[in-house]
């Protein structure tokens, strides 16, 4: 019998930057997805707090026992179609995977996106992150043939969209 992992989700704080950058980069390295054209090399990864001070943006941090174990955000990426936002920077340390925390973070992002008035959510990912891709499929994301918007992340070659 699997025991439920006790966790909390809150909004990002400035002091979270260093740990979140570590998580993003270590997860990408773990899955051999630390390649050019991804957030691994994106300078905004080092200051997510400032990035998410943008209008209609939010980033949520997951904690277990007051330790940051991951996060996910909603962002109004430039050049996306009207009413569309992007699910961004969903990364979890290994001990948080398979616990429902990733799903809870995404659902929190769905809620925020709807509150901001978005009607669709887009994401970009890579085949190396296949477990996450499976979660996106289960949550109703559908595959696209081409990218949307202008994220600058040319290293991502899976694009998905969901109606909110």
Residue ranges and their predicted role:
Residues 1-6:
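Basic/polar N-terminal segments that are highly enriched at the extreme N-terminus
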Residues 7, 11-95, 106-108, 112, ...:
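Acetyl-CoA-dependent GNAT
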Residues 18, 99, 158:
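Glycine-centered loop/turn positions within well-structured domains
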Residues 67, 80-81, 93-107, 114-116, ...:
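Conserved glycine-rich acetyl-CoA-binding loop
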Residues 119-122, 126-164:
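C-terminal "cap" of GNAT-fold acetyltransferases
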